[in-house]
Amino acid sequence: MSSDTQRWFGVVSLFPEMFQTFTEQGVTGRAVKSGKLKVDFFNPRDFTHDKHRTVDDRPYGGGPGMLMMVQPLLDAIRAAKQAAEKKTKVIYLSPQGKTLTQRGVKQLSENESVILVAGRYEGIDERVIEAEIDEEWSVGDYILSGGELPAMILMDAVARLVPGVLGHAQSAEQDSFSDGLLDCPHYTRPENLNGQSVPSVLLSGDHQKIKQWRDKQSLGRTWQRRPELLNDLALTEEQQRLLDEYQQELLQQNGSYSGMRGYDE
């Protein structure tokens, strides 16, 4: 896919107005204004045929809550597919989906067009999922009122990977999780803040030593705060050496690993 290809999102949502600021400000706003990202909305309420524009219905079997009405939702999804003009992946933002990771974001960023279905109420009819949904994605194990916020999270993460969207070409590469690790600490002026100074290596002007320090901090921070991430990585000899150095330096400072943030959780 060409780097200058416009990415398109079709969002199926009962509350498209929630996306207004999101598509006008920040990274996604710049992407939309520059033409690198296009977002169209398909409100199931616009596909109703009764005077009340009903979009919810009772679930079979009883129980609390309502489901999104099938007919308006199906029509909205199909309208989005037609607008895409080509076979497009349809994603349902669901707590039952696979957890969104940076690896998944990279995969999604390779698609020129994606349709996002933001559920409401207690969810959507299982038959709609089976017939119209290609993948289900979750942003975490917690409860939200709808799929709009997860849809924004997914779009923001994808937009950052679209060439030319970020101000610096290396910004996305240096983000946390871009290489499977957490990001290193960052510092700006003043050089001394409440008695705490910027690490001297960052003031040295030695780019090789600065990179080495950042790599070490990234590895060490991941080991301390998200050690499970290291299980999925095959560290190079240099990375393992840097991590060993980080651990030894902490031992010398603290006398043990106990009490370090995340270590004994």
From Swiss-Prot:
InterPro entries: Alpha/beta_knot_MTases, tRNA_m1G_MeTrfase_C_sf, tRNA_m1G_MeTrfase_TrmD, tRNA_m1G_MTases_N, tRNA_MeTrfase_TRMD/TRM10. It catalyses: guanosine(37) in tRNA + S-adenosyl-L-methionine = N(1)-methylguanosine(37) in tRNA + S-adenosyl-L-homocysteine + H(+). S-adenosyl-L-methionine binds at G119, V139, G140, D141, Y142, I143, L144. Coiled coil: none annotated. One of its GO terms (cellular component) is cytosol. Keywords: Cytoplasm, Methyltransferase, S-adenosyl-L-methionine, Transferase, tRNA processing. Its EC number is 2.1.1.228. Its main location: cytoplasm. Homodimer. Specifically methylates guanosine-37 in various tRNAs. Belongs to the RNA methyltransferase TrmD family. It comes from the Bacteria. It is found in: Cytoplasm. One of its GO terms (molecular function) is tRNA (guanine(37)-N1)-methyltransferase activity. HAMAP family: TrmD. It comes from Pseudoalteromonas atlantica (strain T6c / ATCC BAA-1087). GO terms for biological process: tRNA N1-guanine methylation. This is tRNA (guanine-N(1)-)-methyltransferase. The gene is trmD.
